[in-house]
């Protein structure tokens, strides 16, 4: 956050005081300003970041080290990042390639027609696997199919694959930081899927919190700009977000 000059076009004269990458803006927008805060964005892919404070942590578990943000005159804050390329894109694949659903949001009701995945598991490696595996040769796969498997099982398996990938990202972060996250902050289009969010909470055994404003990237960079102009401490970011919904784990340890 700094004074980068003024806009020359569109709205001439408007000062530019914050420039953030997509996921860094989401991290700040989720008020992840303390070491150990962690968020995951559920969009076309999944992108998890955890604030590591002023410490540059080099991952031994397949994650990337990145700058989180820096306010002019202050030390930079760093983060660990894990990314998976296919999350919501797998739902689009069900819709556009297999014609199993008409609209992306239909996947939740279809998946709920079955009580579980029927032992069907999906690996959405359409473009290889990113964090923490980094295997460009991996390809998508469906496992556990029987003559009793149906499209509801497939829908549930696709949703669960998103949660399993996120589990791997957070597990890698916890190993690198030698910690155990208490909760996860979430944003992105797939947060509207209650079945996915509950399953995510269940397998992580952690509470999950969404925000009232789901366009968290825009919120993050907008508030960052405002805080710099008004010379306000970064801790006041909490004044601009409101928790929307919380999912708590409801799965037995045996099942997990």
Show where each model-derived region lies:
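Conserved glycosyltransferase catalytic-site signature
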Residues: 20-25, 44-45, 200, 215
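Glycine/Thr-rich phosphate-binding loops that ligate phosphate moieties of nucleotide
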Residues: 52-256
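Anionic group-transfer/hydrolysis microenvironments
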Residues: 1, 31, 45, 83, ...
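Glycine-rich nucleotide phosphate-binding loop and flanking beta-alpha elements
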Residues: 27, 34, 46-48, 86, ...
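Conserved phosphate-binding catalytic cores of ATP/NTP-utilizing and phosphoryl-transfer enzymes
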Residues: 3-37, 50, 54
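Contiguous, well-ordered alpha-helical segments that form the cores/surfaces of helical PPI scaffolds
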Residues: 25, 47, 220-224
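Short beta-strand segments
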Residues: 20, 39-45, 49, 68, ...
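A general structural signal for short secondary-structure junctions and capping/turn motifs
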Residues: 30-32, 38-41, 83-84, 111-114
